[in-house]
Amino acid sequence: MRETKSARLTRMHDEYDILRQVIPAPACALHFSNPLELLIATVLSAQTTDKRVNTVTPELFATYPTARDLAAANPAQVEDIIHPLGFYRSKTQHLIGLATALDERFGGVVPRTMDELTSLPGVGRKTANVVLGNAFDIPGFPVDTHVMRVTGRLRWRSDWRSAHPDPVKIEKEITSCFPPEEWTNLSHRLILFGRATCHARTPDCANCPLSDTCPSYAPPAGKST
């Protein structure tokens, strides 16, 4: 029997209530002390892990504490610092270009709106939402691979069958189901749940707190449902 929209919404909130209990204090995994640092760290996090980003940002932030400092940086020195992350040459170009635009257009101050943030080179909606939600406490719902995977398996979104889901569509559909004050922590919890339990290749269904209601639940071999 096909699940109605009303039933799906009820299930979504029930499952999120469980995630709130399992993950009571979610937080951004990137280390930062101001909006500029978070913006830079988020840009660096593409195609690598937050944990690895945190190993290089202390030196990067200490060496280039302002957007103007980073804009005037010697690219080779930046490359040397962020080399462990991979793609260090292109990331260096992106960082210096971003810092230059930030300094020239916003006086080095990270803007607080989606439109202004996404006008900066290399800043998309995901990065902007991370900055808005975590640096400014402005509701934002970052959609990364974990969020796409988990919302698909839970069938929280209508295009759960899609092999190439649209992050913007996911953002709009999921945020329409939850109050704005929950958006940032909702994203955090889905990401943490995806990392800890709902893995990409081998989800840990046997220890999943949502196994009773998850439409994609797969019982361990030899166990009947």
Q: What does each model-identified segment do?
A:
Residues 2-223:
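Catalytic cores of DNA base-excision repair glycosylases
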